[in-house]
Structure formats: structure tokens, C-alpha cells
Amino acid sequence: MSHNILIKTALKRQEAFRNLAKNLKTIKRTVHRVDPKAETYLFGSVSEKEHNYSSDIDILIITRLHPAKIHSELWKAGIKEPFEIHVHSPEKADFFKTRTKLVKI
């Protein structure tokens, strides 16, 4: 039984990576519909091109809106696992800007 769960999870992740460009467009469009001033970035192993199918897909969203609002809208748009959504204010986002490669979406 657990073998089937692992296979399902791997196939789901494979599909997310195969459709990465489409998913990133959906993320950007959804976030900008809620907050046109928001900035969206890809970071982590995917932005460094060091990922595999067990990697998550890290997304940084810089906005002054409450994170729950962004998470809710992305969930409705179908953005779920393996996407790891990090929502921060501009001040808190400075941490990411100094420690990792950010690729603007």
C-alpha cells in the first residue's frame, strides 16, 4: 500500500516539474490579481538547477497582504505540493535576497 502512495507522489511531482513554466505563470497571474504590486520569485534548488523529483519548488512572494490571503488564492488556483510558498513583507524578504539566488517570475 505505501508503495502505491510513493508512486503517486512521485508522479505528481514529476508532473509539477514537467509543467513548471505553466505553473509559474499561474502563480504570477494569481498573485498579481490579488496584489498587483507583489513580487514573485523562484528560489532554492530549482533556481540553482540542482533539483530532483524529491525537491520542493520554493516560491517567494513579497507583499504587504496577509500570507493567508495569498495561500488561499494559490490553493484555489491549484498550486499545492510540491510548491513551497513563502509569503513575506518587503522587510522580511531582505533575508532571502542576501542568502539565496532569486529568479524573478
Residue ranges and their predicted role:
Residues 1-41, 47-54, 62-105:
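Catalytic core of pol beta-like nucleotidyltransferases
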